[in-house]
Structure formats: C-alpha cells, structure tokens
Amino acid sequence: MKWFLFLLSTIFVQGILGYHVEREYAWRNVTFEGVNPSSYNVLHSIPTGFAYDAETQKLFVAVPRRYPQVPHTLTEIERKKHPERSPPLSKFSGKSSKDLISIYQPVIDECRRLWVVDVGMVDYKEGQPKYRKQNPAIIAFDLTKENYPEVDRYELPAEVVKNPLSFGCFAVDVINPKGGCSDTFLYITNYEENTIVVYDKKNKASWKVSHDSFKPEKDVNIVLDGGKKYSYKVGIFGITLGDREATGNRMAYYLAGSSTKLYKVSTGALKKKGARFDPIRIGDRGPYTEAITLVYDPKTKVIFFAESITRQVSCWNTQTPLDSNHTDVIYSDARFLFGTDISVDSNSTLWVMANGHPPVDDPDIVNNEFYKPQIRLLYVDTRKSIRRTRCDVNGNKP
C-alpha cells in the first residue's frame, strides 16, 4: 500500500502534465437527450469507449448496460451542436436490424464504417426479461450514407466465445483500403478466456487464437477517490495495428490488462485459421504501467497507452527499444482515473477517455458513498503530444 500512496502523492504534486492536451468533455453525471432523467440512474450510465469521425465532427460513445436503467447503449455527440463541457448523449441515429443490447467500444475503420461488438446480454440478472439475450454480434454501419445503414452483421458462434461479457478491445484490419473494403478482419480480445477472436468478413467465418502471452501476470490494485481499494486480474485486453506491409500484413501489438509487458505478432498469423502463432515479446514498460488500451499512430510511429493506475497517458516510439529509458509521459492529472479507450482519428489527433471505473466484478462499486463518476475525454495532436519527450526521436529531446 505504501508504494501506491507514494505513487498517488507524486502525481498530485506534479499536478497536470501535458501542455498541449485539451479537455474536450467531462461528466460527473451523464444525461441523455430527450429522455426524462427520472427514468434512468445517472450513476449507472458509465461510458467505456468512443470513436470520432473527423469528417462530420461527430463522437460515437458506448454506454454498456453493466447496471440497470441505461436508456441507450450506443450514443452520439455532434461537436458543432454541443460546444459545452458536459453535453447530453443522443441516441445513435443509425439503423440497426435488431435492438442493440450492450456495447462497450465503437471503432471507425479506413472505409468510414462504424464497427461495434454487441455482447448480446446485460451484466445484471434482473435485466434479462427486458433485454432478451441474443447471440453476440459484430455489426458495421456506413457513415458515408444518410442514416448510417447497417452494412454488415455476423453472429459469433458459441465455439469461439463462452462469455462475451469478457470481450476487451478490438482492432479492424482493412487489407487494402484503396482496392475496396470487402477484405476486412476484426481481432477481438477476450480477457477472461485469454483469446483473440478473429472475424473474416469476406468469408463470413470466425475462429479463436490462444497463447500463454495472453494470460494475466498478477493482480492490479487501484484506489478510487475516498480510499476504497479494488483489485482485478485480466488477460489480453488492448490491441492495435501497425503499418501495412506490401503483403497486406501488419504488426499487431497487444497487452494483457494485468501485465506491463508488450508483445507483437504479424497479422498473417491471425488471418489464417490454424496458422503458427509465434509472438515476440518487445519488452517491459516498467512497474505500475498496466493498461487495458493502446493505439499506434502511423504519423509518429508511436504507441500511446492510457494507463490504469498512474492517472497518466504514456508513449513509446516503435523505432526504439522498449524499456523505461525509451518511454515517457505525455499527460498526467490526478483527475484522470482509469483510462478505458484511446484512438487516433483520420486527422492524426489522439483521443483518450477515462471513466474512473476499473473492470472489477463488484456491482456495489457505484453504490460506494465515495464513488463519483469522473468521465473525461481529451484530445491532442499526436506530434504536439510527444514534443520534447523521449518518444520524439526526430525532434527536440527533453
């Protein structure tokens, strides 16, 4: 416990680090546009993921049904319409062929398709009569067309996933965007089953991959405001894709949520069912740097990590060895508690979300007298974010 108190005190002394980072939105209580506040519980509406469409300046925000009384699981915000700090969330305006049950993360690909994985069930038992259990499904909506029509849907079979509630992050791999969008793969992590579920859109097929590097290493301890301590132990969670090679393959970088080690493997080992899987351990990021989400920026060749317990966003340039001498911090704030999602949009802007809610199996966490939602969404230009850090290998060094 002493090390953790020391770590937190260090962060509070630092105050805010990240001169170029701007806070776009912050919520204590999420509200929904057009929905009577008395019909839902604001403490239960906790966003976990987002995607930003730079062309329309619209944010898509996922609010999973982990608790009762969540009116919409997929929502949107028009930045032009809502310049205020804590805008209400509007129901997703796209057209789905089935009701959306519970979504944790949206992702926009290079073809401007919005992908989601609907886990098909709620996290609480009393909600099953209202939200009838469905097969977990991968769904895509076309953002280039009016009303965002559904353009792909695939229900995942039981042999590839036993518990869809333990899905982590996912990455979308468009093999040749200039040649068309049909040849696409999704790589979905499962932090409880320690697997990656692969979806082949073109052939409407799926399979799972297992490896020891997907497993968690130790419990992660996190202290919420008020001093309440929680622990969790989760396997593979975050995944991001590197630059596309001439063969169409890319490096997939991944990490377990309860580990500080980073691995990579060619997507060629994922795209072919039964292929040999030989990942490379790149290195260890150092003590207390656990994260559940990461993203690669092709412009800077940097991977950014939204860390879980340090209340900071860190970076590592993939052109350098991975160790504590080649990583750095681009943002640190005592109010940035538990990073849940991070992405780079088509304009090379880094976006990162924290919601103050770790992945612990404790329904009473939101009923804790000290619990107060701290949902923050930040953005910064990727080049500006690494200026004068160890991640800026071509610019000014610190």
Swiss-Prot record:
InterPro entries: 6-blade_b-propeller_TolB-like, Royal_jelly/protein_yellow
Residue segments, region Disordered: 73-94
One Pfam family per UniProt: MRJP
Compositional bias (Basic and acidic residues): 75-85
Places the protein is found: Secreted
Superkingdom per UniProt: Eukaryota
A GO cellular component annotation in the UniProt record: extracellular region
Signal peptide region: 1-18
Organs and tissues of expression: Female salivary gland (at protein level).
Family designation: Belongs to the major royal jelly protein family.
Name of the molecule in the record: Yellow-related salivary protein SP04
